[in-house]
Swiss-Prot record:
CDD domains: Tryptophan_synthase_alpha. Belongs to the TrpA family. Pathway: Amino-acid biosynthesis; L-tryptophan biosynthesis; L-tryptophan from chorismate: step 5/5. PROSITE patterns: TRP_SYNTHASE_ALPHA (PS00167). GO terms for cellular component: cytosol. Tetramer of two alpha and two beta chains. It comes from Methanocaldococcus jannaschii (strain ATCC 43067 / DSM 2661 / JAL-1 / JCM 10045 / NBRC 100440). PANTHER family: TRYPTOPHAN SYNTHASE ALPHA CHAIN, CHLOROPLASTIC, TRYPTOPHAN SYNTHASE, ALPHA CHAIN. Its EC number is 4.2.1.20. The alpha subunit is responsible for the aldol cleavage of indoleglycerol phosphate to indole and glyceraldehyde 3-phosphate. Keywords: Amino-acid biosynthesis, Aromatic amino acid biosynthesis, Lyase, Tryptophan biosynthesis. GO terms for biological process: L-tryptophan biosynthetic process. This is Tryptophan synthase alpha chain. The gene is trpA.
Length: 281
């Protein structure tokens, strides 16, 4: 049985842990390597977010933009992403998989078809960073129909009224943007992020996971004192970048996977250390 996001958060709560959500672009630098990398990530992450590469990823920083280009150049496409998720679910059904995708990809396939394929591949949720809440009704209804969580992003600039609307439609977890702007690895967790988590907790019981700019274990420890999970993306993708040769392929697969595993394992440990700290509603 493939684990749902709500079940995962319940399991973590019972263990006294917070969620470590790891992001990786499907097909980076090619499908075979990305599958191996994601298998390694699944050993330590609680939830895995798979990016479906897109030619114009507006919410992503340069690191993920480059990863999208590499993946697209290797022939990655949405149908292969479904296959990838399916394979990973056969090996790690207890680690929920979430797609991060831009609306154009969903629109091209057709909303219902896309959500149905998510269900068939065992994808637990979808994040669509460029879909505003005002235009999400149709996709939201298909997600409800097929039992797939629709995860929205909220930012420090999101006013309370809008925040309430988003939280009403959001399921699985809410993606708390730690800084306004684009993704990337930053040095310190901002105070406004902490304020935003408090606001989310005031309006909803949905788990709040913080992403955009989390790159170190210290960040994970700090953020999981107040949030239900930490999302790490660019810092993981940078490991891919570091191991590329001049042709854009992995130089030494073994070394790459070893460094990747050590990094994600260490980040997961950061969600255990502060897990006993209660979240103040």
């Amino acid at each position: 049985m493939i684990m749902k996001l709500a079940e995962k958060f319940e399991e973590l709560k019972n263990k006294g842990e917070k969620a470590f959500v790891a992001f990786y672009v499907g097909g980076d630098p090619n499908l075979e390597i990305s599958e191996k990398a994601l298998e390694v990530i699944c050993k330590h992450a609680d939830i895995v977010e798979i990016g479906i590469p897109f030619s114009d990823p507006v919410a992503d920083g340069i690191t993920i933009q480059k990863a999208d280009v590499r993946a697209l150049n290797s022939g990655m496409n949405p149908l292969k992403a479904f296959e990838l998720a399916k394979k990973l679910n056969e090996k790690a059904p207890n680690v929920p998989k979430v797609f991060l995708t831009y609306y154009n990809i969903i629109f091209k396939m057709g909303e219902e078809e896309f959500v149905k394929k998510c269900k068939e591949a065992g994808v637990s949720g979808i994040i669509v960073p460029d879909l505003p809440i005002e235009e999400a009704d149709s996709l939201y209804n298909y997600c409800k129909k097929y039992g797939v969580d629709l995860i929205f992003l909220v930012a420090p600039t999101t006013p309370d009224e809008r925040l309430k609307k988003i939280l009403e439609k959001c399921s699985g977890f809410v993606y708390v943007v730690s800084v306004t702007g684009i993704t990337g690895a930053r040095e310190k967790v901002a105070e406004e992020t902490k304020e935003l988590i408090k606001r989310v907790k005031k309006f909803s019981k949905i788990p709040a996971c913080v992403g955009f700019g989390i790159s170190k274990r210290e960040h994970v420890e700090e953020i999981t004192e107040i949030a239900d999970g930490a999302i790490v993306g660019s810092a993981i993708v940078k490991i891919v970048e570091k191991h590329l040769d001049e042709n854009g392929q992995i130089k030494d697969e073994e070394k790459f996977l070893k460094e990747l595993e050590e990094f994600v394992k260490n980040l997961k440990e950061g969600t255990k250390k502060k897990a006993k700290v209660a979240i103040k509603n």
